[in-house]
């Protein structure tokens, strides 16, 4: 036998995707080549470049979401990918929200999971019931959700997401979750006190952080009492303008202070 021949000169090398039979793992999907089929997006288009970036860098969940939103994909694979992050207590963990690591269920991860279910039209029924049972188990005495719950000692977390033993309820997490559940016509006993908390928190903001305003609006956008929500949103709008919490003129960044916890220029 003579020496093995390589590919003919001028032929692009394409690595073979191994079946990974020994480990039992599924083969990794090949990175899609540039679009060449008539009727498909030009490989230089923003969508094609974004798709290639997703295939190169994203988790399976984000790949499935991209396929659902931009390639006519089915919601089933999105939910299957999301289930990998779900725990037996009905919450979600395993770094679904990358700012918190470790397997323990956390309100932040669970809020992220609800956004995914909402995006694919599956935030209801038994899925929502399981999540609400988890939310009930981790709520503070005032019916709200904390940003984090004490997890396993040593689980990594971003410095701006402190994990403490007895965390307070926060509008930052509770507002978006309650608003999303109302928007999907979910009714559960947990929502009654959580909704009351959001009303009280949204209507009492005086010198809010921009993230608090964002969380309040996520609640108010879907709150059942529309006249009350409109009045609260109008008041928040005046606060945002008076306290210059949002940059209205991109050419005049110096006119607005940088929010606490942000670096220079992070308006």
Task: Please report, for each region that a protein language model flagged, where it lies by residue.
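Preference for long, amphipathic alpha-helical scaffolds in soluble/luminal domains
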Residues: 15, 20-267
